[in-house]
Amino acid sequence: MSINKKYHGVVVPMVTPVTAEGQLDVAAVERIICFFADNNVSPLLMGTTGEGNSVSQADGLLFVQTAVKAAHSHPSPKTGTAITIYAGLTGNCVSEQIKQADAYTEAGADVIVATLPTYYALTPAQMEQYYKTLADSIKGPLMLYNILATTHMSIPVDVIERLSHHPNIVGLKDSERDMDRMAACIAISKNREDFAYFCGWAAQSEHSLALGGDGIVPSTGNFVPEMFSELYEAAVNGNPERAIQLQEETNEIAKIYQAGRTLGQSLTALKVMMQTKGLCDPYMLAPLTRLSAEEESEIAQKAKNV
């Protein structure tokens, strides 16, 4: 990893805190952004963990505006500057995506992170053209987001390599669980300052950094950002033993909300854990729902014992 790269470090795919009525919880957004800044991690708003496909356009813009304002009013104590705001972009109407991306950029988002449209199965050529269209059209820098688990498509490595040379495409967040693919994608970004690799497979955060990755995107960072901040620093500063130890510890914490649950259920459970720290309530956006009171109580007790 080249620390000269503009985009690097820990980017937490932030939950979207909402009220019982399903409206954005602005106060909770502010609390979480300050919590992240204190631990020198940045947020990815409206990604998979943030229920991105369920956030309305109006709330999405309010989310970005609130996060940007909080980040600038509460800079990271470590750097003295505002943390970077990454804004997720999902959807199937490209013209609407371009408008929304520009609204986020105008509101102060630093990077737009876009998944593939998911209604139709796309050919590699169509995937490449989609990202070229976005990159050519939007006002802010673009990061590719590959997530097979939800899009049911995988952006081929050769497509990523070609897109990596587009002047407005600054990196890749890859959540696909494939070690060979990880190595191949890191090889694309290695020794380049214009394109960064972020690992979205949280359980392999340390491994990706050891291979030369630039950043990590762990959902468990919503609960323990300080552990991932330390993991990153240990990995890039020549302390692999400590990085591996932290990887093992955070993997165990992740089991509290992930084990035996669907992806959607795990996001509810993660909010329950965050509630124990006074960060947000465990309300969800439709179609996701809360867990039973008994299950929430069990999760909360485990979270308090961490």
Question: Predicted segments — roles?
Answer:
Residues 2-12, 16-152, 289:
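Active-site beta->alpha loop and helix N-cap motifs at the rims of alpha/beta catalytic domains
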Residues 6-16, 39-40, 220, 224-306:
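C-terminal alpha-helical cap/extension of soluble enzyme domains
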Residues 25, 29, 60, 97, ...:
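Generic structural signal for well-ordered, non-membrane alpha-helical segments
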Residues 29, 60, 64, 97, ...:
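A general structural signal for well-ordered alpha-helical segments in protein cores
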Residues 32, 63, 130, 163, ...:
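A structural signal for short hydrophobic/aromatic patches embedded in well-ordered alpha helices
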Residues 136-137, 148-254:
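Catalytic alpha/beta core domains of metabolic enzymes, predominantly
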